[in-house]
Amino acid sequence: MSQSTLHLGVVMDPINDIAYKKDTTLAMLWAAQERGYTLHYMEQDDLFLQAGKAYARMRPLTVHRNPEHWYDLGEATQRPLAELDVVLMRKDPPVDAEFINAVHLLGFAEREGVLVVNPTAALLQCNEKLFAQQFPQCCAPTVVASRDDVLRAFHAEHGDVIFKPLDGMGGTGIFHIGPEGRNIGAVIEQLTLRGQRQIMAQRYLPDIKDGDTRILLVDGEPVPYGLARIPSAGETRGNLAAGGRGVSRELTERDHWLIQQVQPMIREKGLMFVGLDVIGDYITEINVTSPTCVREIDDQRGTDISGMLLDAIERRLA
């Protein structure tokens, strides 16, 4: 199959609302267009199922390297997803019921031979906070619970704890409770919806002052540089969405050890684009839904991470 004949669909948040300067999906689309791919644009609610086949309202998409005008969309048509070669599922979390339904619909296209990145089974299995817990040797002490007594006992044991929801992104809903335990009851009540929802508590890692580092794996292979996301003053969240700044750095020996721990399972699940979040010596999250930070690393290091991903896609489709 020649590159020029490849039809790539993307399911994403509204393209009009993306951050032109740092959007990873846009970088992927530029790279695909430059290789001669035909681009097809979809939002999550464009997907539908009829008589056991997955369809979507698709619009032809052209992307531009122009901060004032970065895309053009053609006329919408309803077409089977099976007409596409590959679909990039780039809808940002939260992983709510609608996200899960969309992934199930993409699974019907997968069964008809469409390559979905990342694979639908892996998207359904790999909660970004919980997936990392399959590698306890790589993680800081952690508990997942909805019960007030379990969460309080964990705080009493560790003294300095981060509480966070299991389905957030960009640093939303994260609380740091110090040894004095101020507001712990209110935080647990708010995050667990009074005991109705599981949340994560993790021992606070002082290394966050140096930022957390995003490490990208493309088809199981690490990009040689990570992005340290350094919190703004007084923040405990390094996420760029929470005001952190991104500084690219080479991977450390410990980073490579962490990667080696997770690589076999990432390859086994067919995950083609994954972001590890590392604080100090520990993995805190394994992002599989819509990993970012490509633009910042490419800009600072001259890498072509989208090109690496497209090479991997072409190998799968060959």
Labelled PLM ranges:
Residues 33, 110, 155-156, 267:
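Anion (oxyanion) recognition and catalysis
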